[in-house]
């Protein structure tokens, strides 16, 4: 069977060349006579893999020396607890609620102190990003938290909030490495890799060193302390070794594509193909305020639930899979991450045009 066009929100499409490289090395990684899956994480060979992955990520993002790169487990959901456990030293933090994942992070943080919801777009079903230029930031807040790209609702912070000097913590799971980023604008950014970088099971955090301290909330487990992972080079315990190996290959693929500036141009072009069609269509329409549209996740509807279901079924039969919208929203959603080729989006639009003509 030929490969389908996979529009899943995560786990998601990976570069085909990366999959081919991994397949070629599955039984024998560079003359070791074993797979990376079987390799001791304490071996020199694996140490070289994780060191190269970190070096390539630093090159891609321009990460300054005073930021640590941590490869961890637990996904973004575990970070909902780790962030307040490690950073909420005064037991106060401010959260901007622009979707399901920011809301979950905020609810988790309330278990550890005062988590203020300083702004929200819940009033319009998270279809826009609120003005964050002059927020009522708590003077005692240890950080301001956002989910930068909202996978479910298809919105994106195109301008970071004015945190009034407080460290910005950002969940970038679904826009990680989709465009250049000024790391110095963040105290911390993190993301589960299963959307835009690699297989599920790895979360990457980039944290300013002054935020990594022993001064954590009482009772914080050893494994949930950033300092534990920073002091041990992400090797305190057995890391998600194979997942990190795949991430490293994706970093090298991105470098070969020209880096994040080049991948942004490609992503802008892809998104334009789909958004231009949605804006002109008489049947399909987008659900997000135009200025806040994501380049990665594009939700759309017909306005008729039965017709939506018919479209999803027909699309799957035609080789366009995982287009069903999130269970909390309905409709459709096309996740067009870095590895989705432009031709995949164009062919989807061609299919949508045909479906519109026939319905």
Over which residues does each language-model region extend?
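Conserved PLP-binding catalytic core of the aspartate aminotransferase-like
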Residues: 284-315
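PLP-dependent enzyme catalytic core of the Aspartate aminotransferase-like
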Residues: 2-4, 317, 330-359
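PLP-dependent aminotransferase-like
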Residues: 77-144
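Conserved active-site segment immediately N-terminal to the catalytic lysine
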Residues: 169, 183-194, 203
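Active-site C-terminal subdomain of aminotransferase-like
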Residues: 15, 193-275, 289, 358-359
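Conserved N-terminal alpha-helix of the aminotransferase class I/II PLP-enzyme fold
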Residues: 33-79, 86, 100, 108
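A glycine-/small-polar-enriched, mobile loop at the entrance of the PLP active site in fold-type I
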Residues: 3-54
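Active-site phosphate-binding strand-loop segment of PLP-dependent enzymes
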Residues: 10, 109, 120-176
